[in-house]
Amino acid sequence: MKILVPATSANLGPGFDCLGLSLKLFNETQIQKSGVFSISIGGEGSDNIFLKKNNIFVNIFYEIYEKLSGKKDNFRFIFQNNIPLSRGLGSSSAVIVGAIASAYYMSGFKVEKKRILDEALIYENHPDNIAPATLGGFVCSLVEKNKVYSIKKEIDKDLAAVVVIPNLAMSTEQSRQALAKNLSFNDAVFNLSHASFLTACFLEKKYEFLKFASQDKLHEINRMKNLPELFEVQKFALENKALMSTLSGSGSSFFSLAFKDDALALAKKMQTKFKDFSVQYLEFDDNGFEIC
């Protein structure tokens, strides 16, 4: 079997831990029954020996496969990782969702996306990345009694993303330590209103309001202080026809959204201006993970 799982960009400014969308940048994993266990890694992490010794995908896969099938079989895992690691593009969510869905498939069970999403919550307790990795599109989610409830909206085909990827790993755990311990009532209301309005902009295609709807007072500034150049990335994007520009997840990547022609032009300008960073033009994925 082969499974493709997309990269994701979460939070989107004010939608902390609840908003996210799916990008056409995929991790590809092939799994085959084998006489002996083996792992092959290409792309991101291929030079990391620890990913072969203690692989999270493999660990989750076997945990669920053995629970579902009652068997202890050997498999050959072939990873082609295209999602940058620890850059705020959902690499951990792609691993979790991919492992769970693969285990269900290889155990002979029906792969139901709602079930996969609920089970993924066990391994990542906020749905902002795992939901779009599972469902695709723009997704608004909440958690109630250990279950994920999501509403998905397909993203307009006229839009595209420009993602700026610094050469700085930033784990979610590390990034959360930078967050303020207390939040004022006014700032809480600010984020609630902006996250709600941002969601409505995507649902109703009111893209002209995204620039101010995507503002945040909860997490972005504190996280961006770890890499001050990101403030310039955001300013430059908004001055060059980006409809919105936000920290991607916990960082260090930065996500900008624009109409396709503007996004292509912005990507070229970004690459020229920010020579030390990788810049990718990406279209949006509306399917979530797919088993081939």
UniProtKB/Swiss-Prot annotation:
Pathway: Amino-acid biosynthesis; L-threonine biosynthesis; L-threonine from L-aspartate: step 4/5. It is an enzyme of class 2 (transferase). It is found in: Cytoplasm. It catalyses: L-homoserine + ATP = O-phospho-L-homoserine + ADP + H(+). Keywords: Amino-acid biosynthesis, ATP-binding, Cytoplasm, Kinase, Nucleotide-binding, Threonine biosynthesis, Transferase. The keyword Cytoplasm applies. GO terms for cellular component: cytoplasm. One of its GO terms (molecular function) is homoserine kinase activity. GO terms for biological process: threonine biosynthetic process. Its EC number is 2.7.1.39. ATP binds at residues 84-94. InterPro entries: GHMP_kinase_C_dom (IPR013750), GHMP_kinase_C_sf (IPR036554), GHMP_kinase_N_dom (IPR006204), GHMP_knse_ATP-bd_CS (IPR006203), Homoserine_kinase (IPR000870), Ribosomal_Su5_D2-typ_SF (IPR020568), Ribsml_uS5_D2-typ_fold_subgr (IPR014721). Belongs to the GHMP kinase family. Homoserine kinase subfamily. Catalyzes the ATP-dependent phosphorylation of L-homoserine to L-homoserine phosphate. This is Homoserine kinase. It comes from Campylobacter jejuni subsp. doylei (strain ATCC BAA-1458 / RM4099 / 269.97). The lineage of its organism: Bacteria, Pseudomonadati, Campylobacterota, Epsilonproteobacteria, Campylobacterales.
